Amino acid sequence: MVNKDNNYTAMQKNQYSSGTTNHPEHNDNPNYWDILLSDLKDSDKWSGKNALDFASGKGRNVSNMLSTCNWNRVDGVDISEGNIEFCKNWYNAKLSDWYCNNGVDVSDLKDNEYDFIMSTIALQHIPVYDIRKSLITDLLRTLKPGGLFSFQMGFGEGLESPLGPRSAYYTNFYNAHGTNSHHDVRVHNESDVIDDLKNIGFVNITTEVRPSFSDSGHTHWIYVKAYKSE
């Protein structure tokens, strides 16, 4: 278990307290639709089912998912109180519930609740492996058997960046002075992610590496899909 009062989470909650931008430019990333959300193109498959956006920001991804399929519900969870309050007011007529999490797990969410979980430009901002593992392990708990987790992280060589330092995948850098690209994690090889997800309990894991989009902190992104066993 990760202590929710750790230095990194305290810094992150402080920086995100008033909210973030909604990053509408990332809707123009073709890989967002063709890889990250490609499974939603078969809209009938998701009719009446539940989806979740982890690190949902101001609701862009939730809104996009709602527009693609006839879901029962598409929820959002985020560390920022400002973001969650915004979404509760802005999307109050949508089929969505909104949760503010503690930064180390998603304990307010039910077991076996979601058929599809996504996350983008989020996990790459957490250079603390133990926190990422805690979050991903808890997201697995919330997936229904056979459910899909689709996410993206920064990928490339070395640890240099014009925006600030990068940490390796298994590093625990609790004393980062900033988040949201100021001190990211960088995946160096696909096997690190695949092996980690297998150890957590996911199955049928696939990855695709593509050039990054509107992200000068990483030359490439890795898109990952992993399933909960039936």
Residue positions per predicted region:
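Class I (Rossmann-like) S-adenosyl-L-methionine-dependent methyltransferase catalytic domain
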Residues: M1-W46, K58-V106, Y129-D130, F149-E230
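Conserved beta-strand/loop positions that form the S-adenosyl-L-methionine
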Residues: F54
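Class I S-adenosylmethionine-dependent transferase superfamily signal
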Residues: M65, D138-L139
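A short acidic, Gly/Pro-enriched loop at the edge of an enzyme's catalytic core
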Residues: D108-I117
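A short beta-strand submotif of the Rossmann-like class I SAM-dependent methyltransferase core
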Residues: S119-A122
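A short, conserved alpha-helix within the catalytic core of class I
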Residues: I126-D138
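Short glycine-dipeptide loop
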Residues: L143-F149
